[in-house]
């Protein structure tokens, strides 16, 4: 009987001890990530990072050139006797422009000098030759200073009329006409002018080896609209390039053409080539016979009207 009582007493004591241990075990489990979870507030460094992110301005997109929904909304200023423009979106290959972009023509003037350079370089490469340093200096002057005498020299050396005929056939121009033995009087539509620009950009004109050199040289045209010194030193850095947002200027190559005709006024063409687009503006207008300020402002205006800032 005494043994049974002792066993019962021991059993009761053990049960009591186990009941006392349960709350302690639960506390340890909670501390190890059990059902009871306590989240501590973020530390000072994390809170600072979150505040910095929240204070950042919303991202913005850079301005760009784009075709307008209504091409007819791009209008010339009063006084122009001819006005046409065309815009090629390189992402789609679509050309849009003025109603006369495929029918109205202007004399190409110095705009065609980039082709004269490209044609010479491509043909030289095809014959396994390399231009001399003197030739490259000539071609550079022809583009950045719009040197007429050098243009005439290379035009004649490469075949005269054949130079422009190759321009038409290689660049797929459909409404451009050769003026016999006179490169500056080549008649070209705005639509063909952007095709010509694309031909320069995609390597067809100068070939793979010399296209980067040509486009880079066209980014360094010198002289403002008032810098018309002589036929060998003419300022051609004006027009479309002056109407572009600053972010687009470094990647844009240009070649303008301009001549004043007694009785007919200025014949002016502006060509700009960017990796995303090609734009040309053609205009005839009366004005100062020395400085083509009025037509230059027309080209500038078209570029500004085509500039948009995308929305996020």
Where on the chain are the PLM-derived regions?
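Conserved catalytic neighborhood of penicillin-recognizing serine enzymes
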Residues: 124-177, 189
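A short glycine/serine-rich beta->alpha loop
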Residues: 99-106, 179-183
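Glycine/charged-rich beta-loop-alpha catalytic/anionic-binding loops adjacent to active sites
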Residues: 93-103, 174-175
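Short alpha-helical patches at coil-to-helix transitions and adjacent helical residues
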Residues: 111-114, 144, 148, 187-194
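Penicillin-recognizing serine hydrolase domain
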Residues: 4-5, 27-90, 156-312
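Amphipathic alpha-helical segments within well-ordered protein domains
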Residues: 121, 151, 194-198
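Active-site SXXK
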Residues: 93, 104-129, 142, 279
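Secretory targeting and sorting signals
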Residues: 1-28
